[in-house]
């Protein structure tokens, strides 16, 4: 059954905002969460980015706000600055007609400026745990009138070490309040927070089959580590994405990839947690404006980003878990548009491919490694399309005489071929250096291997002659040697 926002009996101010934002039908997480939020129930929601969860908690939160009150009435706790900004922008849009005042609070921004903004009596605070707790300790934020608390991406805050800060923040909130907790997974520390600070919460869960969007084409390429960069650049040449995000597993990888892409002639910038907030915001603005065509990011830096127009996602490194994969590809295929996601799998990472497919309930199609000739053909097609566009604009009178002179000496096909050659960006083979990353193996696969070794399988000693056991020890030594040298080893791509 389709549920529309009219079914929630919202105020006219909120309906104006919802209609202006283009919302029509409620997503599964919205259909289940909004009625519970409006009735002041505590909610535990398991949902991924891209499912509409910000509106799921934002609509009931804003509906209950009294814009005339000078008090902080709701707080939203988010793991990263980017997500805090994104959530605050969404809440501002939802509450614009109601005149609800929303203020983002995060580290990296001048605290004096934040204190001045807090004196203007915001109704809703969206902040990162550390900076929120800082203001609470300074008494520049008082939570004694808060009636709604939202924890967004609670598992990510746990991974980033914010669990103690969250407990301290919640301890400052009145006991009579509503709590909405959203988390892709429910590890034990998150469950303990729910038990301690929530009252008979209702559970809302978006099933795995609803996690990935049908209008995202998902592919994988089996490629050796040393060939990954050339594979990436050839795909960029063939597919010519309007806006692309490339995901790397580490900060070092992001820095090296961004530098290497620029060396090869692609406009690229990287974002990760070690960059200052100002630098990250500059990179994001350039990406949104199309000044750069490729954004290279870590998982944490990309959390909560809502950038329209992303056509391609490249998982240069396999994500550390299937849930991160869903977060990554959710950057494309938004607002009803189609998108493509390509994941590079090294031979030792096939277990991660299986784990991702089991989680998403969807098989990825295999894509063959692109060749150099295919990359050149891709760039030729870009040139041909540019020529067609120029011809259709019909503003060529100034060039007609020169064209006629060329045709007197050469046939038309030769002239056009020369023009295409001159205008085509040929694949660049500038040498680049990338540090190898260790392959990512599924935890389930690791556990299976460990279990087999404990059971005496896989070449271990089982009470027979010691030969197989000696070989296993030798293999382990070789593996350890490879790992220790792998941190220092660098590859050269051409």
UniProtKB/Swiss-Prot annotation:
Domain Helicase C-terminal: 215-375
GO cellular component annotations of the record: bacterial nucleoid; cytosol; plasma membrane
Reactions catalysed according to its record: ATP + H2O = ADP + phosphate + H(+)
Compositionally biased intervals (Basic residues): 443-452
Matching Gene3D superfamilies: P-loop containing nucleotide triphosphate hydrolases
Cofactor: Mg(2+)
Disrupted gene: phenotype observed: Slow vegetative growth at 37 degrees Celsius, impaired growth at 22 degrees Celsius and 16 degrees Celsius. Another report shows no growth difference at 15 degrees Celsius. The presence of CshA or CshB is essential for viability; in a cshA disruption mutant further depletion of cshB stops growth after 1 cell duplication. Others show a quadruple disruption of all RNA helicases (cshA, cshB, deaD, yfmL) was not lethal at 37 degrees Celsius, although both 50S and 70S ribosomes are decreased, growth stops at 16 degrees.
Residues reported to bind ATP: 47-54
Swiss-Prot/TrEMBL GO biological process terms: response to cold; ribosome biogenesis; RNA catabolic process
Enzyme Commission number: 3.6.4.13
Triggers of expression: Induced by cold shock. Constitutively expressed at 37 and 16 degrees Celsius in rich and minimal medium and in exponential, transition and stationary phase (at protein level). Protein level not increased at 16 degrees Celsius (at protein level).
Residues annotated as signal peptide: none
Location of the motif Q motif: 3-31
Protein name, per record: DEAD-box ATP-dependent RNA helicase CshA
Species the sequence originates in: Bacillus subtilis (strain 168)
Phylogenetic placement of the source organism: Bacteria, Bacillati, Bacillota, Bacilli, Bacillales
Gene name in the database record: cshA
